[in-house]
Amino acid sequence: MGFITKAIPLALTAASVINGAEILETRAGVQTLADKYIVVMNDGISDKDFDSHRSWVNRNHRRRLIRRGAKAMGGMKHTYNFPTGLKGYSGHFDEQMINEISKRADVKYIERDARVQINAIEQQDNVPSWGLARVGSKEPGGTTYYYDSTAGEGSTAYVIDTGTDIQHEEFEGRATWGANFVDDMDMDCNGHGTHVSGTIGGKTFGVAKKSNVVAVKVLDCNGSGSNSGVIMGMEWATKDAQQKGADKAVANMSLGGAFSQASNDAAAAIAKGGVFLAVAAGNDNVDAADSSPASEPSICTIAASTEQDSKADFSNFGQVVDVYAPGDSITSAKPGGGSQVLSGTSMATPHVAGLGAYLIGLGKGGGPGLCDTIKQMAIDVIQNPGASTTSKLINNGSGM
């Protein structure tokens, strides 16, 4: 997955069946990682049977390396065990080993792991932002953000991205480092994650100015990562939120790619775990039904609007879109201090995650049901939203 200030397609769609397990085939143009796979177990598999399967994989992998004396494969790398769903693992295996795994009756499907790359559409320093004013107003063109003084207090936002500059003055000590699944640098060396975090909970740029922010790094300095690493970040955020109170948590994923069943299943597991998840629709001006995790129906999928209340020309659209939010020329925090301007559905999505945190602070409940609340509060103003797409734009209900 890459973040949605422009993502290359990533996906595995059509399925072939080999001895019972689906090995999902890769679409043309997808940058797969050589000999790397994501294996997803059957629904409902017990922890005991999952442990037994992994032991079998590790034994067989070691035996194959000893017997062959050929190119070394790394074997199993990440293990996924969401509290409310997805169990599986990723790793580096040769074709024969993958075929052996596919014969197992306890395997649901296998995907090739894939890489994504994000690219900012536009960047400019120190330009006033309009997005906040639009969230707090019924009419366009305002310059004031109206909001309740609770401002998301007591809520926590998990930003699954490039990391966050937790020392930035925007966060006033409310940002913490959570986990890193991509490199050994616990910092935002790209800038995307800090911008997203600022829109959620920054004192100046944030929709929920008193919310806590947790950085979950899954993309590197170039905005690049893998589906397998992103799923690890999703699992970590789900477990941490459940330990601290899932009904007080929101998660933001300003990233994505072409359809991936594993990514969608992981997103569904976050929602099933009681966490409100906002996901970018994508920046390719196409139907988001072919994007992941945007196409997962149990989460909240966000398209980008302009200051003139029209669909941003880059924004994806379609029936899977739940709501529009400001995403064109949005000002927010940048690493090291100060601000920058970025555009994309990446920038629209944290307005919605921030609104979710804001509503939690107001006592409006939490969890995936927040998406319905946000849609009910939205105003019907988007011009030319796209085929079969909602024309609703988010609003915080301040009445202004």
Curated annotation (Swiss-Prot):
InterPro entries: PCSK9_ProteinaseK-like, Peptidase_S8/S53_dom, Peptidase_S8/S53_dom_sf, Peptidase_S8_His-AS, Peptidase_S8_Ser-AS, Peptidase_S8_subtilisin-like, Peptidase_S8_subtilisin-rel, S8pro/Inhibitor_I9. GO terms for cellular component: extracellular region. Glycans are attached at N222, N252, N396. Its main location: secreted. Residues 36-118 form the Inhibitor I9 domain. Disulfide bonds: none annotated. Residues 21-119 form a propeptide. Keywords: Glycoprotein, Hydrolase, Protease, Secreted, Serine protease, Signal, Virulence, Zymogen. The keyword Secreted applies. The keyword Signal applies. Residues 1-20 form the signal peptide. The active site is at D161 (charge relay system), H192 (charge relay system), S346 (charge relay system). Residues 129-400 form the Peptidase S8 domain. Coiled coil: none annotated. It is found in: Secreted. Pfam families: Inhibitor_I9, Peptidase_S8. One of its GO terms (biological process) is proteolysis. GO terms for molecular function: serine-type endopeptidase activity. Secreted subtilisin-like serine protease with keratinolytic activity that contributes to pathogenicity. Belongs to the peptidase S8 family. This is Subtilisin-like protease 7. The lineage of its organism: Eukaryota, Fungi, Dikarya, Ascomycota, Pezizomycotina.
